[in-house]
Amino acid sequence: MSDDKFDAIVVGAGVAGSVAALVMARAGLDVLVIERGDSAGCKNMTGGRLYAHTLEAIIPGFAVSAPVERKVTREKISFLTEESAVTLDFHREQPDVPQHASYTVLRNRLDPWLMEQAEQAGAQFIPGVRVDALVREGNKVTGVQAGDDILEANVVILADGVNSMLGRSLGMVPASDPHHYAVGVKEVIGLTPEQINDRFNITGEEGAAWLFAGSPSDGLMGGGFLYTNKDSISLGLVCGLGDIAHAQKSVPQMLEDFKQHPAIRPLISGGKLLEYSAHMVPEGGLAMVPQLVNEGVMIVGDAAGFCLNLGFTVRGMDLAIASAQAAATTVIAAKERADFSASSLAQYKRELEQSCVMRDMQHFRKIPALMENPRLFSQYPRMVADIMNEMFTIDGKPNQPVRKMIMGHAKKIGLINLLKDGIKGATAL
């Protein structure tokens, strides 16, 4: 390892860490990325779907050479009970505007490619090394300690993922609140491209993204997801960490039951399990965003809690990339000023406030509280399924008007509850 002082050391080679290194290296900064895994992305998990707009701004036309899987053209949202599914299906032609596109990705392919772009721009990358501590002189972070080695830098960017222990060691990241996190589990199941296209009604390199609420998380806060890759599908679920103690089954068992659901089982029939992973997921929204800047240090990506689950979209990577670009731009400007103090690095927060990151985090700040409503994942999926079942059942008895069907099932939840939940949902979204 070099004894020289770096302009910046980035801890973590996920999407945020790699992009931060790329932007700084392009500007001629001396950048080192340290990753505890054996390669970039090997410790990371996502559903996963990448909304292209932020990476497109940094690497125009990236999808031509990047190892993306499929461009998403089919969107599905389902409410599941144990035996039924009510599904909204939206299909569109592939967007002509690259910034409007989104892609399914596998992190063990995407992240090494991103790190390769950073290295080609001049960044140094050291995998398989754990950063044990941050080095400080007084209140200022001046580098990192890895084993017996101390590496110095003007700025350290923490891209070490959700529940950042290094951020916590500085007092920047508070103790974990279980209601701010979820546990995610995922399987990658191999299928042929022809099977995928036939089963999901897509063609060529089109992709499908499918979100589920209700039975996948056993009626608790959370939900399921399915993304089509080139020759596999990513199938998994998340369950709120604060709800797991009340669950009737383990998270792995939830996934097994999800795979056996009548709406899912035919889609994965004959598939081969290629990968299993589990990970913590930030779900707290704006309320869990920690102190982002201190003397000589900034926090980006999942470590900063930049994730938005709106129920119909789940965003993390695009926000991580935007935060990484903001942090990198700040370091570049700080070097020009020869000022790496907290007041100088506060430009990072201003950059975030002008980007989609804090604007969207602020706009949807009420979503996490909305998602804690247990009726969203238990009673409402059941109500929708029961209404649809009654509408489509013809048994020789006189049919009720649809309005009476709906009102009868709505009363089971309570009209006041429906009104309160509707108002809360409208104000949150």
UniProtKB/Swiss-Prot annotation:
Signal sequence extent: none
Keyword Oxidoreductase (UniProt): yes
Positions that bind FAD: 8-22
Enzyme class, spelled out: oxidoreductase
Domain of life according to the entry: Bacteria
Keyword Oxidoreductase found: yes
SUPFAM superfamilies in alphabetical order: FAD-linked reductases, C-terminal domain, FAD/NAD(P)-binding domain
GO MF, any single term: oxidoreductase activity
EC number in record: 1.5.5.-
Necessary cofactors: FAD
Keywords: FAD, Flavoprotein, Oxidoreductase
Gene3D superfamilies on file: FAD/NAD(P)-binding domain
Family: Belongs to the ETF-QO/FixC family.
Function of the protein: Probably accepts electrons from YdiQ/YdiR and reduces a quinone.
Name of this chain's protein: Probable electron transfer flavoprotein-quinone oxidoreductase YdiS
Organism lineage string: Bacteria, Pseudomonadati, Pseudomonadota, Gammaproteobacteria, Enterobacterales
